Amino acid sequence: SLEYKDGIKDNIEVVVNSGDSDFCSQVNFGVDTVTTEWFSILEMDDEYSKIWFNKVEEYMSHYNDVEVFLPIVLDVSTEGKFLHFTNEPVWAPEFSDKLGFLDNDALINFPNFQTSGGVYKKEAFKSVGGFKSSIKLHFVYELLLRMTYYDKTIMTIPKLGYKKTNMRENSLFFNYYNGVKKVDPLEAKWWFNTAKKECYFKQDRGIMYDSVEQTV
């Protein structure tokens, strides 16, 4: 059973996904069921800051052409210790063509951005095909490359909007690095390069890694 604070319960609808349960498929399923113009992605054990959605609303009123608003993300360990910030480089001079905005060239040179916590226009997300479940490890990078390649406008709001817990036990990326789905460095590099190639295609082409082929 799920319990919510007073005033929140009536605004919560639990939707059961009876299909594929990988991260990308679950997000895509969730987006398909959304009836609002915008949506956001909240991962397990992560937190929005108290000011985040107020800031999004404020920036929406000034930047009508933006289709994705990313937060500055506070990355912490499972013990709650500070690791680093993410999504903030767009506010560094000369990082991208336009201060505060993410573009394709900037992503090619600096891939470390996160999608969780962001607020997305559903139409923009759907128009480029959403997440690709066949892309392992670098599916976030591939999506952002694809969105910027197809000229979707992505802005980082210069406020701390999201706290992300890294490497939670049995989480997807924990398993990629430590668990049953562990990805070795050679495969990780292959998926990174594949993300840069697949971003030109809106559809998920069902890419698969062949370890034998890579060692020949």
Question: Model-predicted segments: where are they?
Answer:
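Acidic donor-binding segment of Leloir-type glycosyltransferases
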Residues: 1-18
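Glycine-rich, basic loop-to-helix element that forms the pyrophosphate-binding segment
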Residues: 17-34
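Short aromatic/hydrophobic "clamp" motif used to bind/position activated sugar donors
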Residues: 39
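Conserved donor NDP-sugar-binding/catalytic core segment of glycosyltransferases
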Residues: 51-87
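Catalytic beta-strand/loop signature of glycosyltransferases that borders the donor
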Residues: 72, 155-161
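Acidic donor-binding loop at a coil-to-helix junction in glycosyltransferase catalytic cores
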Residues: 136-143
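Catalytic core of nucleotide-sugar-dependent glycosyltransferases
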Residues: 149, 159-168, 173-207
